Amino acid sequence: MAHPHLLAERISRLSSSLEKGLYERSHAIRLCLLAALSGESVFLLGPPGIAKSLIARRLKFAFQNARAFEYLMTRFSTPEEVFGPLSIQALKDEGRYERLTSGYLPEAEIVFLDEIWKAGPAILNTLLTAINERQFRNGALVEKIPMRLLVAASNELPEADSSLEALYDRMLIRLWLDKVQDKANFRSMLTSQQDENDNPVPASLQITDEEYERWQKEIGEITLPDHVFELIFMLRQQLDKLPDAPYVSDRRWKKAIRLLQASAFFSGRSAVAPVDLILLKDCLWYDAQSLNLIQQQIDVLMTGHAWQQQGMLTRLGAIVQRHLQLQQQQSDKTALTVIRLGGIFSRRQQYQLPVNVTASTLTLLLQKPLKLHDMEVVHISFERSALEQWLSKGGEIRGKLNGIGFAQKLNLEVDSAQHLVVRDVSLQGSTLALPGSSAEGLPGEIKQQLEELESDWRKQHALFSEQQKCLFIPGDWLGRIEASLQDVGAQIRQAQQC
């Protein structure tokens, strides 16, 4: 086979050629190309006149010798119009029931069926066999059909609990298309003089029959690593828990895995990577509601688990808690002592913060943990300005418990030693202390754990950087993943500077 990276570059150039003159249809072209390269079916949902049929016609040019068939379904469509007319001569001379399939679906590599849900039962039943088994029963013969890509289109979804459900389930990739939105793209589309039926693909990029057949075998050799399977299973389990999640058949999961293998193969990789799982957003939805739900769940998977983001944050939280415990052991030496002011003519004693306390946000440690607002609290973050106002004028004081969430109302007082004391609902108190001096540096135990965590983060970020070169994944998804990893890295570095 060709070098994996050369193959990935070729497929990228092929896709770019197919996309010429089609505005805001890059993702649709790329996924239809991936479907064609892996022998799958695509459903395009959208209003009339948005280039659904043109997308299918373009895909024919990806192959050197591909034949195309397209048909607009109506309630009156007959099997003869899709699968070919009966041979009168064969019926008359030999009594054989045989169709003349030349120029019809049974002999086409690329098939486009518009308004698919208007097809009658006779067409649908034959079409199901064609999709499932790549076979067509022509009289007494069962003929193998060469179909590589079926693109079905409609401006509506099939009715629930209808006879169309079986066919809809066979359409692995489902894309929701709309009109051209961007102003510049709309202008370019209006003024374009390109003939939409011209072949935009250089012959050197077109795929031969031999290459296509060889690639089908090689796609099946792409491995599914354990950690990627665990992500898929996590997604499946999460969907099973949600009451509004769509039903996803085992058959659809199975076919989706082959699509992920194809994505990895044509991206120059020997194994499915977490980034390939983003394709599931176009495979698992059923209707508008489930489309949003699936995207949300995959977003959580990609930005929280696929590169161990949440796991690393959990580890970081444990390290920070341990660091605070070590600091609490030194807190008696660092208890915050406020300065008492004169207040001769004041009804309330006034205080101020020591001059060496200058941070805009103060993190104060509890000498012993307390349960505040149903949370085990070991430290509280105060806005300096709010704390100064409370010391001077009294009133309400709020702070963030363990430094997270919204600031909560606190029962805070100054004791006789001029220390700040926070109390729980049972009036048990805990003195607040400043963290240990930064000059002391991080304890060796904490420093080592943070260095190990940073090393793991670098490995995960490097893995993502290697895997993100995937033609079939939209750039905005890659941007969100990168942002999630950078956020984890920033929190680790911040902890190292404490």
UniProtKB/Swiss-Prot annotation:
GO annotation, cellular component aspect: cytoplasm
Keywords, in A-Z order: ATP-binding, Chaperone, Cytoplasm, Hydrolase, Nucleotide-binding
Binding, ADP: Y23, G49, I50, A51, K52, S53, L54, E196
MF annotations from Gene Ontology: ATP binding; ATP hydrolysis activity
Family from the record: Belongs to the RavA family.
EC number(s) stated in the UniProt entry for this protein: 3.6.1.-
The protein's name: Regulatory ATPase RavA
Description of how the protein assembles with itself and partners: Homohexamer. Interacts with ViaA.
Subcellular location: Cytoplasm
Residue runs in coiled coils: none
Keyword ATP-binding assigned: yes
Originating organism: Escherichia coli O1:K1 / APEC
